[in-house]
UniProtKB/Swiss-Prot annotation:
Cellular-component GO terms for this entry: endoplasmic reticulum membrane; nuclear membrane
Secretion signal span: 1-19
One example of a Gene Ontology biological process annotation: nuclear membrane fusion involved in karyogamy
Keywords: Endoplasmic reticulum, Glycoprotein, Karyogamy, Membrane, Nucleus, Signal, Transmembrane, Transmembrane helix
UniProt keyword Glycoprotein, yes or no: yes
Domain of life: Eukaryota
Its job: Required for nuclear membrane fusion during karyogamy.
Residue intervals on the Lumenal side: 20-452, 503-504
Pfam families: Tht1 (PF04163)
Glycan-carrying positions: 159, 206, 313, 404
Family recorded in the similarity comment: Belongs to the KAR5 family.
Subcellular location, principal: endoplasmic reticulum
Organism expressing this protein natively: Saccharomyces cerevisiae (strain YJM789) (Baker's yeast)
Record protein name field: Nuclear fusion protein KAR5
């Protein structure tokens, strides 16, 4: 964050300085003097620096003065001295309003200059002026030293200003390009991240909604199916019981005495209460199944709310981080403005003495340092973005694992429901078998009572048991014992058939 703030601070400083201070200087010196063969100064520079105004004397000393200041009067050849003295004389003639000026002296040509000297010799006034200027060349050199140095300093200042302005524009352009590219990349990343979040959220919501609807439909269908089966079975059983009960009531009157013992044995074994207990257990199991389905529905709803809460918390945290970054950027801008005021005062106080020796190398080093820090910041941001992506993918993987666990639990519940349904059907088949067996026994008893041969056999057996002979010492088994054995065998058979259901 500090490196980012430093980059923004530098960008604002460069932009402000290059656009305000250097802009003012460039606006004032935009029309600065272009030193060519015909040195012409603009109105702004002439008003700010009067010594830059183009004059006849200045034009006359244009070639002589730089050589004299740099190497001394002895290094200047005679032709240049003569030409300079002639031009100075012409300037005096023009300044004094002299009407007659030698025509050959108005042409910048070496041959014309020799003709000009011959014409100057023809007049004592002309020659005296020329001779005086030629003798004063050494003093003229030193008299114009300070204006010449001022002009050279101004040239240096303008050149440095132009260099600094060009450098500032280049840095500003580069930083603007980098900032634009960074903003574009950041915006693209945020757009991709937001789009990814929306896709994940939509997929998760769609999957949650589809799974919830499927689960509710399956549970509702199974519950309705079980209720329908139980209702239909109970109705059929009730109707059949009523019908058979009416038939039995009509037929039991005829065989009441014969079946009384069998009824007593059945009452002792309490089969009816066992059937009712099994029925109550089945209903309790179905009730537990309904409650378990409701618990699964509530658990799935809580998981859905938890996922939505996690996504909302993550979105709020991301918004808070972006708000913090915006606040830091605002604070950086305020600090940049405060530092810029001090920077401007330092710039005005130490521009000329430190521009050549300090600022240009420091700006070059600063540019290199800035590029290095920018590269490091870019790599750091890439690492942070990669870390954020890993955390996001890890969070969604955890959510997927939780959903898979919920699916496994639902599969387990479905298996248990299938097992309960299977046991209920087995119990129904056992009850049906018991009903058919009872029906068959009653029918057999009814047919036996109506059959005359059965009564004949019973009479023979009774007479035989009452009047048995002494030769045959056989102990007859009473009929009651037969009934008891039959009831015992029936109980054993029914226990074998219903044992697995009772164990469950």
């Amino acid at each position: 964050m500090f490196a980012m703030r430093y980059v923004y601070l530098f960008a604002i400083c460069i932009k402000f300085v290059s656009s305000s201070e250097l802009g003012k200087i460039n606006n004032l010196l935009q029309g600065r003097l272009i030193y060519t063969d015909n040195s012409v100064a603009t109105n702004v520079l002439e008003s700010k620096f009067p010594f830059l105004k183009s004059t006849c004397v200045k034009d006359a000393l244009k070639l002589f003065l730089p050589q004299c200041i740099a190497n001394g009067l002895e290094s200047i050849d005679a032709e240049t001295r003569v030409e300079t003295a002639i031009k100075l004389s012409i300037c005096e003639f023009q300044a004094s309003g002299l009407g007659e000026i030698p025509e050959n002296c108005m042409v910048d040509d070496l041959g014309s200059m020799m003709d000009c000297m011959f014409e100057l010799e023809s007049s004592s006034q002309w020659w005296t002026t020329y001779s005086g200027n030629y003798q004063r060349l050494s003093s003229i050199c030193y008299e114009n030293l300070l204006p010449f140095e001022k002009e050279q300093i101004l040239k240096l200042f303008l050149n440095i200003t132009e260099l600094y302005d060009s450098f500032g524009d280049d840095v500003d352009t580069k930083l603007n390009h980098l900032m634009f590219q960074m903003e574009q990349d950041s915006q693209n990343f945020l757009d991709d991240l937001a789009r990814m979040f929306r896709n994940y959220d939509n997929e998760l919501r769609n999957a949650t909604e589809s799974n919830r609807i499927i689960l509710e439909n399956d549970l509702s269908f199974f519950r309705n199916k079980v209720n329908d089966v139980l209702y239909e079975t109970s109705e059929q059983l009730e109707v059949q019981i009523i019908e058979k009960n009416s038939q039995l009531m009509n037929e039991v009157d005829t065989v009441h005495h014969i079946m009384s013992d069998l009824a007593d044995e059945l009452a002792k074994n309490d089969i009816k209460s066992k059937i009712n207990d099994l029925k109550d257990d089945s209903l309790n199991n179905l009730q537990d199944l309904v409650e378990m389905s409701n618990d699964v529905k509530e658990y799935y709803s809580r998981n859905n709310k938890l996922v939505n809460t996690e996504l909302e918390n993550f979105s709020m945290g991301l918004k808070k981080q972006l708000g913090g970054m915006s606040k830091d950027l605002s604070e950086s801008q305020m600090e940049a403005i405060e530092l810029l005021q001090g920077f401007n005062s330092i710039l005005h106080d130490s521009l000329l003495p430190s521009m050549t020796d300090e600022i240009v190398p420091e700006m070059t080093n600063f540019k290199n340092t800035l590029l290095q820090e920018w590269t490091a910041i870019t790599s750091t941001l890439n690492g942070d973005f990669a870390l954020w992506n890993e955390e996001i993918f890890s969070t969604f993987n955890d959510i997927s694992e939780k959903l898979n666990g919920t699916k496994k639990k639902l599969d387990d519940i479905e298996i248990r429901v299938s097992l309960v349904h299977k046991n209920v059907m087995t119990m129904m088949r056992v009850l049906d078998f018991m009903w058919k067996t009872s029906k068959m026994i009653i029918r057999c008893g009814y047919l036996a009572v109506k059959n005359k041969y059965y009564w004949l056999l019973c009479s023979v057996v009774w007479i035989w048991s009452k009047y048995r002979t002494s030769r045959v010492n056989v102990k007859m088994i009473p009929i009651k014992r037969y009934y008891q054995w039959a009831a015992l065998l029936l109980s054993i058979y029914l226990g074998a058939k219903t044992g697995s259901l009772i164990d469950f």
